[in-house]
């Protein structure tokens, strides 16, 4: 009788805490003064500041964008503009960011910080459903031309954004998907099942089985999946 092999169980090597997180951030490329100012403004003035991209993500994305020599990026979910600002700062003057959001409530602040940083000419803010913006880019013949896409918006829309982004990203480009651990709830069988968790679990399973891409789910911040398409 064939014996089944038990799943490999992995262990955390380091028990992370705030001291270790700050040590890691301090030993990475530092945020610019304008990035720090945007973070401080958001924490002090925006009730939902938890939605802000984390500092460790910013230095990581800067590295990815520069390794890719990226010139065309997409930011799905702008909030107060930190991720778009990070992408714009990481690229040369020819770099462009298509920034997708549905509301001006928070992006009105983003516009001010982008201008203050001198990168507003690099960022094209589209206030409409991201799915519409992505489809418009496809219809304009921009398939397989984008270097980097960051998805951090409504979780129930992630599957649509993933599929459209796969059409737009070039071979060798990277799609980064945020919040794929849902504060650890994805691995908790007793977690309260609600639409966001259902959507993220389904997408994680879909990407795992997706033969079109190479993928790695990293426990950075609230979890980031990095994807590059094979063909």
UniProtKB/Swiss-Prot annotation:
The keyword S-adenosyl-L-methionine applies. One of its GO terms (molecular function) is S-adenosylmethionine-dependent methyltransferase activity. InterPro entries: Cation-dep_OMT, SAM-dependent_MTases_sf, SAM_O-MeTrfase. Keywords: Metal-binding, Methyltransferase, S-adenosyl-L-methionine, Transferase. GO terms for biological process: methylation; response to bacterium. A divalent metal cation binds at residues 152, 178-179. The keyword Cell division does not apply. This is Probable caffeoyl-CoA O-methyltransferase 2. PANTHER family: CAFFEOYL-COA O-METHYLTRANSFERASE 1-RELATED, O-METHYLTRANSFERASE-RELATED. Its EC number is 2.1.1.104. It catalyses: (E)-caffeoyl-CoA + S-adenosyl-L-methionine = (E)-feruloyl-CoA + S-adenosyl-L-homocysteine + H(+). Transmembrane segments: none annotated. It comes from Dictyostelium discoideum. S-adenosyl-L-methionine binds at residues 53, 75, 77-78, 83, 101, 130, 152, 154, 161.
């Amino acid at each position: 009788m064939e014996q089944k092999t038990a799943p490999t169980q992995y262990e955390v090597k380091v028990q992370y805490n705030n001291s270790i997180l700050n040590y890691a951030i301090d030993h990475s490329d530092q945020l610019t003064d304008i990035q720090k100012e945007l973070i401080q403004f958001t924490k002090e003035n925006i009730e939902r500041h938890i939605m802000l991209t984390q500092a460790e993500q910013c230095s990581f994305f800067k590295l990815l964008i520069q390794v890719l020599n990226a010139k065309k990026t997409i930011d799905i979910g702008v909030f107060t503009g930190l991720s778009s600002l990070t992408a714009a700062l990481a690229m040369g003057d020819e770099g462009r960011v298509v920034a997708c959001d549905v509301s001006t409530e928070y992006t009105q602040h983003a516009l001010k910080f982008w201008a203050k940083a001198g990168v507003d000419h690099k960022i094209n803010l589209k206030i409409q459903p991201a799915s519409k913006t992505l489809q418009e880019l496809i219809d304009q013949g921009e398939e397989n031309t984008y270097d980097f896409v960051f998805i951090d918006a409504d979780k129930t829309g992630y599957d649509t954004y993933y599929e459209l982004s796969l059409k737009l990203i070039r071979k060798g480009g990277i799609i980064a998907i945020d919040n794929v651990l849902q504060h650890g709830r994805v691995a908790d069988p007793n977690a309260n099942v609600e639409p966001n968790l259902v959507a993220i679990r389904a997408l994680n399973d879909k990407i795992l089985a997706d033969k079109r891409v190479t993928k790695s789910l990293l426990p950075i911040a609230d979890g980031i999946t990095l994807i590059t398409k094979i063909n």
